[in-house]
Amino acid sequence: MPTTDHFSRQAALYRASRPDYPPELFSFLADVAPAGDLALDCATGNGQAALGLARHFAEVVAADLSPAQLAQRRPHPRVRYVAAIAEQLPIADRSVDLVTVAQALHWLDLPAFFAEIRRIARPGAVIAAWTYGLAQVTPAVDNVVARLYTDIVGAYWPPERALVESGYRDLPFPFEPIQAAPLSLRADWPLDRLIGYLGSWSAVQRCKDATGSDPVASVRDALAAAWGGAASRTVVWPLALRVGRAAR
């Protein structure tokens, strides 16, 4: 089954509102990869993870099926963007040191994708996939976000979202496990940035399509009251990370 595109229509919002991944994540992956020649970021979107990889690898190929997402790409001299689905990659056999999938593995055709990874991976190459769940701000803000997530747009999440909710624990991952230290995404955001992030959820877009109204607007006042008078607050997303090694 081909990969589904959930984010093209909100590509600009996605780029503007998604949090950055911690630099320690990319340092760790570079340390465990067998070499630093070529990294591949699948379902790259606008290249958010690809730029983190570019600090450590001589070349990064960043692939995505969405022309709208690639139009928002972040240029870098060591990053080459390609329009391709993750299950059919324009990459030579046994050429890649590291494969990453950031916040997207649950959308892929996993058997086809894993077969493609076995084809392109060098002996001992590393495969890493990560996801993050709901933002954590304060108990009051978190309660409003949880109400939006569950009560208001809960029916509009695709079934694959359950893999995110389990932190990818229930996702098949047929590679030799590599243990990683716990990591989190952290950002100091104003309230408007959090609201933009909530608007980038795929379920919010599906709810808009079905109802004609903006579900985030329905909780804006409650979010503002819970947020209080702070100009910005620290937002935290615990990262769920699966890392493995291909056959040597």
Regions found by a protein language model. Give the residues of each.
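Class I SAM-dependent methyltransferase Rossmann-like catalytic core
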Residues: S8-P19
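A short acidic, Gly/Pro-enriched loop at the edge of an enzyme's catalytic core
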Residues: E87-L98
